[in-house]
Amino acid sequence: MSIRFAAAFSATLLAAVVLAGPAHAHGGHDHGAPPTPVSNSIAPRGEALSDAFELTAVPRDGKLTFYLDRFRTNEPVRGAAIEVETPEGPRTATETADAAYMLPAPWVAKPGNHDLLVTVTAGDVTDVLTVSLNVPDARAAAPGAAMAQPSPTQDALTAASTIVGGLKDRLVAKDPVLVATAAAAFLLGMLVVVVARGRRGVPAVALIAIAITLTLGTAAFAHGDEDHGKPAPAMPPVQGAALIAPSEATTDLAQRLPDGSIFVPKPTQRLLVLRTTMTEAGTFRRTVELPGRVIPDPNASGVVQSSVGGRVSPPPSGVFPRLGTKVRKGDVLAYVTQPVQAVDVSDMRQRQGELDQQIGIVERRVERFKKLSVTGAVAQTQLDDAQSELTGLRDRRAALDRVRLEPETLIAPVDGIVAQAAAVSGQMATPGAMVFQIIDPARLWVEALSFDALTAAQDATARLADGRSLTLAYQGSGFADRNQAIPVQFAVKGDTSGLRVGQFVTVLAGTDAEQNGLALPRSSVVRSGNGQDIVYEHTTAERFEARPVRVVPLDGTRVLVAEGVGPGKRIVTLGAELLDQVR
Amino acid sequence: MTMLAPWALTLAAGLAIAVPVHAHEVVGTGPNGGRVTDAGKYHVELVAKDATVDVYLTDVDTKPVPAAGFKGTAILVVDGKPARVALTPADGSRLSGKADVPLKPNPKGAVQLTAPDGTSASGKFN
């Protein structure tokens, strides 16, 4: 029994070595055409890729339509020049309204393989692409369809026979050596089993086996070359597609193919606005969302208050600055005139009278002294004293007048615009009341309440209700609790237009926790029927394949793909849920 | 089971081997110092020097294929602009053409060939 198994194993091994020989020795590559997919209801098409573009060519009714998209984003390219090397010479395709490029091509109706050379120039990028179009023979396709409508078992048998047929094809077409090798190995296996059953001459058999293996194996290795230009094996017939008579005009409809991938023709992709992104692995900080509010920058805003109670009057221009008026630091915005109480008025009148009286007396004394000092009857010092006294009295009198006339000026403390104005002519202002608020609209801050301690100097973004986002620079955070949270302040960087003070924003700030993975927009992950999270990978120009993924939340707009797809894949970011609806 | 197992094993091994090798891009250097790529059932080697474009044609076994009867076009990108070069058979397996502008040593582009039987093939050089 054990010997029988040993024999079987050795035969297997032998066959494996001998048959596998050519496969390993095959130093090159297959020259097969790209898999011509899909179902009979889809028109033949060709596609080509470069690192910048994705080109799809669809022949129909003697015309060739090219769809040109960006490779990474799947965005249609408009305004490109497409030049095609046709059998009739170089031709230029004309752009149509729906961002496709049309080329009249009567030669494309001829069945067979058309190899096109397409030069694409879009902006400053030039690319040469090779497109292979395989136009099937309508007559040849007919008999295949005649035996249509196979049962599931037939289907399976057909699939199996296709695989075997492929092997046979490969073997027959390849070269006799390979066939002979296979046959010899098989016979050898039989021989080994037969001999082993007799349990005789095992060493002899082993010797023979080694000898034959070496001989045949060397022969196989000697064929050090590759498989060329074999037509790709036909796809196993598709049951659904087989029901469609091939004579019917092929309509390109988005459909789920039997292998689970989704075929979406380019025009439909544009209708659905499918966009992709290239996945890149990276390290991301987990972010938290905080409620925030726009506040003015404390160093670029100010309030204008009256220090005394009084009557508000307009500045020299005659009008109060309105809301939104631009003011500069030092501009006079208003006056506040102190009212004078009745008792003060009588007091001042009294003082005024006294001073006027004294001034009169001193003036006369100065006159008299001036005359007498010339004769020497009065000393010069006496005249000087009298003159100083007069000056002093006049100053006091003038100051008394000024106190009654001069109001307090309210001036702008900073450059900015008037954000609040409470000035009305004739109004009585109370001391400390705010008359104006001045804010520099280009310098705004955001104050958020954080429940976590944020990393210092950690930049953040703020999202507005309309979807816009602002870049924020960390300024500082408080140490005292407010509503069981810590106030954190950020300065808004860049454009602040459209913001107003007090506006609510959502602040997205990073935390210390770092995660590795691929960041994708939240919209690219959809939930499949069985509840699994999936993303759609853009595998070829018009094919999308669902990939189950494990995602972890990253921030408000993105998720992190921890497992399921690798870097360098094109993943649908826009329109994934529409793609998921394709049946 | 006793009789079946060995044969089943043999058969399984045979099937396992039948899985074909996967297709892949070819890039290499040819005997004439140019880059080699696939073009349908041929291999083409592109040698660009100054304004001259030479394309050497080989087959499955890297044996030269007589170029007589072939037609070809090469489109090569020079300084971001495509240069179209018509190729005509020269001696042996060589097709040759002249570009309007001098070429860089390894230009990006593609070569299209039309065989005497009317079939076309193209190869891309990145």
Stretches with model-predicted labels:
Chain B
Residues 2, 10, 14-126:
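Intrinsically disordered, low-complexity terminal tails/loops enriched in metal-binding residues
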